[in-house]
């Protein structure tokens, strides 16, 4: 194996901890040309599609990549903003705000950056950049509160694959999940309360999570259970009775059975039942994206109203909500434990590095 190029080791180099915020990814533009490589990378991941590779290669390259890019591009065009893809815009803002929060609350400097599992900026690219900036300890913090092999695990795969090709490796920590973390639940509840204070409350709250194939649950993936726990804790925090909320799953792809009940079918049923107002929130999406802004806010609204519903509200994701940024910061700090020197000061750090360098040079080191 050929390892990545390394600069010559220099004694006394400033070192620090880092946090890498990882989200799923987005195409570079809302066009079929940009969607094709993005979808190819995403759908070629065996963590995402678990069927025999040879068969899937034929389906992907012979059918899907010749039809789906145009359809997906139309959906992305409906939500694209002047700043770009909403997912990328929100994730970048979250990283900047998290950096500011940690700058105020962490005992020592922390580098914060973000990466996408698919598309750019990629995980290997950003990890290399953080290492070059002096990070010798990096926490990989997924934007997915609920663990799933098809989201969380594949992000870790990419990080570990980069680590495997790196000669002078930084220490790497991963955060598996925070679906039941009190700070996360409080942020979700605060976000909903803020929305309801301005727009009133619904007859039914639909908590929609991204779906995964049913067989993943049967094979041991805890995702379904973690979604249910998040929903239960959020309902309790809001004081909701069982009849006041539903837990559903969206974004089904292909013909296989996915986790149920499906969000679209539930919205249609609520409309037929004559429910006056439905609010939809997506607790598993910490940043608004195609699945929330187009699939829920547009398609979901149309389905509910067409079935006889009267009023539909999509409650925005956590995005840059102040309580979410604080929650993200506290979650990060807890997982940086032992990596941040409580007694750190710039002067003490400089003195320690200079002493280390002078000792190394005295022993014959060149740098």
UniProtKB/Swiss-Prot annotation:
Pathway: Porphyrin-containing compound metabolism; protoheme biosynthesis; protoheme from protoporphyrin-IX: step 1/1. Fe cation binds at residues 210, 291. The keyword Oxidoreductase does not apply. InterPro entries: Ferrochelatase, Ferrochelatase_AS, Ferrochelatase_C, Ferrochelatase_N. Keywords: Cytoplasm, Heme biosynthesis, Iron, Lyase, Metal-binding, Porphyrin biosynthesis. It is found in: Cytoplasm. GO terms for molecular function: ferrochelatase activity; metal ion binding. GO terms for cellular component: cytoplasm. PROSITE patterns: FERROCHELATASE (PS00534). This is Ferrochelatase. The gene is hemH.
């Amino acid at each position: 194996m050929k390892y990545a190029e390394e600069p010559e080791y220099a004694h006394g180099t400033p070192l620090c901890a880092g946090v890498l915020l990882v989200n799923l990814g987005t195409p570079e533009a809302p066009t079929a040309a940009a969607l094709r490589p993005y979808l190819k990378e995403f759908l070629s991941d065996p963590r995402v599609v678990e069927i025999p590779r040879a068969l899937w290669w034929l389906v992907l390259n012979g059918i899907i990549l010749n039809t789906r890019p145009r359809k997906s591009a139309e959906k992305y065009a409906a939500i694209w903003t002047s700043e770009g893809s909403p997912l990328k815009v929100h994730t970048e803002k979250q990283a900047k705000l998290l950096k500011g929060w940690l700058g105020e609350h962490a005992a020592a400097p922390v580098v914060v950056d973000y990466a996408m599992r698919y598309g750019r900026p990629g995980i290997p690219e950003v990890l290399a950049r953080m290492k070059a900036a002096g990070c010798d300890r990096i926490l990989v913090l997924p934007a997915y509160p609920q663990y799933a092999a098809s989201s969380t695990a594949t992000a870790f795969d990419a990080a570990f694959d980069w680590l495997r090709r790196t000669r002078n490796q930084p220490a790497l920590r991963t955060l598996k999940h925070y679906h039941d973390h009190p700070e996360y639940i409080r942020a979700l509840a605060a976000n909903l309360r803020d929305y309801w204070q301005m727009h009133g409350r619904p007859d039914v709250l639909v908590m929609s999570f991204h779906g995964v194939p049913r067989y993943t649950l049967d094979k041991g993936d805890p995702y379904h259970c973690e979604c249910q726990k998040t929903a239960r804790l959020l309902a309790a925090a809001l004081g909701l009775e069982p009849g006041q909320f539903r837990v559903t799953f969206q974004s089904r792809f292909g013909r296989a059975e996915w986790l149920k009940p499906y969000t679209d079918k539930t919205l249609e049923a609520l409309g037929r039942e004559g429910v006056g107002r439905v609010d939809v929130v997506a607790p598993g999406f910490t940043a608004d994206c195609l699945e929330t802004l187009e699939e829920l806010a547009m398609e979901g609204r149309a389905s509910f109203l067409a079935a006889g519903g009267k009023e539909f509200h999509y409650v925005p994701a956590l995005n840059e909500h102040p309580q979410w940024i604080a929650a993200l910061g506290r979650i990060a700090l807890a997982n940086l434990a032992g990596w941040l020197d409580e007694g750190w000061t710039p002067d003490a750090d400089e003195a320690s590095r200079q002493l280390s360098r002078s000792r190394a040079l005295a022993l014959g080191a060149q740098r």
